[in-house]
């Protein structure tokens, strides 16, 4: 999907966000205090976002301040796919409540089409959205991702320490996976 400010969320603006209305009709508001997103900490960054998204709002809005943040790529599946495109992501994330916040857990597979003494898997029988929609010989569900829906932070965990491909990714990207 093309990036657009209409798909992004601004946080830390000068106005409150509407959360919900109480049974008595009172509007409850709040302000984002998370660390997710990209800080709009200077005019140069605001101009860069205006150019990137083709929108003037970051430059002309009275609501954007140096403390404002832009959160884009908010879809949890798209977010992890951009972060780790070399993994194959299951299309069925599931929500959990962790520390009072909604977080999504996603399964990821390491795969290869080059593994000794193995034969190609028949992918015709796999369900749609399995994340395994390509030719492979080797596949393991070795990685889990946890995406915080409030601030967008993503934590990747290797859950199968015996997977040599996951270990190679961990060596190649030492700061990507959480211990």
Pin down the residues of each PLM region.
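Soluble extracytoplasmic regions of secretory-pathway and membrane proteins
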Residues: 1-179
């Amino acid at each position: 999907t093309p990036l657009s400010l209409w798909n992004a969320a601004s946080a830390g603006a000068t106005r409150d966000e509407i959360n919900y209305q109480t049974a008595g009709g009172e509007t409850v508001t709040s302000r984002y205090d998370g660390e997710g997103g990209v800080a709009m900490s200077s005019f140069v960054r605001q101009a860069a976002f205006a150019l990137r998204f083709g929108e003037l709002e970051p430059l002309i809005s009275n609501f954007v301040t140096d403390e404002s943040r832009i959160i884009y790529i908010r879809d949890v599946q798209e977010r992890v796919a951009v972060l780790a495109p070399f993994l194959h992501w299951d299309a069925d994330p599931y929500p959990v409540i962790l520390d009072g916040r909604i977080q999504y857990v996603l399964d990821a597979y390491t795969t290869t089409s080059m593994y000794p003494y193995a034969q190609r898997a028949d992918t015709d029988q796999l369900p749609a959205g399995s994340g395994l929609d390509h030719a492979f010989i080797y596949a393991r569900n070795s990685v889990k991702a946890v995406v915080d829906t409030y601030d967008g932070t993503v934590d990747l965990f290797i859950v199968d320490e015996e997977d040599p491909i996951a270990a190679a990714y961990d060596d190649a990207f030492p700061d990507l996976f959480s211990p």
